[in-house]
């Protein structure tokens, strides 16, 4: 059984146990989860002592306060674990801005940023705002977003296709499980250069194909 004390999980949260509980009467829950009803604080403390356990105040603002008879050490560990799990579950979201006329070099930089974030388990949201007459280039903007899906498939995935909302197009990526994430753009310089050259060649091929199509038309 622990001495009278308070467990501080952070600056705002604490738990009173045993003789530190101030209420004169408390609603007591035993170690099996059964309610023992409202008892004088002395009797509640005695029952906990008889079982070699602690009286822990779990709902201090209830009327009367609710206390449980349990192993304080295990209770403290459980609280600590929940806090850690909660922090892990709070996935950070990083936002990246794009421009419809972005050049290949800047596009590669955006890919590297997104890949680095997702490699760390962070979500990434791309935003593209069409200014003024750029609204007439919706097809280019959507193609750019669809290209992102292909270029980042090795590290993340998106739940829905990019859609235009007013003048803004957004696309959110969720990182793949850690054991399935691969690096493509954040590699040693020699490998990155090779990939950059491959992307340039692909872009040239697309431009040439587009020009030939216009000639035929």
From Swiss-Prot:
Record-annotated membrane-spanning stretches: none
GO BP term, pick one: ribosome disassembly
Keyword annotations of the record: Cytoplasm, Initiation factor, Protein biosynthesis
Main location: cytoplasm
A Pfam family per the record: IF3_C
Keyword Ligase: no
GO cellular component terms listed in the entry, alphabetical order: cytosol; membrane
Domain of life assignment: Bacteria
Protein localization: Cytoplasm
InterPro entries, per the entry: T_IF-3_C_sf, T_IF-3_N_sf, Translation_initiation_fac_3, Translation_initiation_fac_3_C, Translation_initiation_fac_3_N
GO molecular function: ribosome binding; translation initiation factor activity
Keyword Lyase attached: no
Stored HAMAP family: IF_3
Subunit structure: Monomer.
Family under the similarity heading: Belongs to the IF-3 family.
Task of the protein: IF-3 binds to the 30S ribosomal subunit and shifts the equilibrium between 70S ribosomes and their 50S and 30S subunits in favor of the free subunits, thus enhancing the availability of 30S subunits on which protein synthesis initiation begins.
Name listed for the protein in its UniProt record: Translation initiation factor IF-3
The gene coding this protein: infC
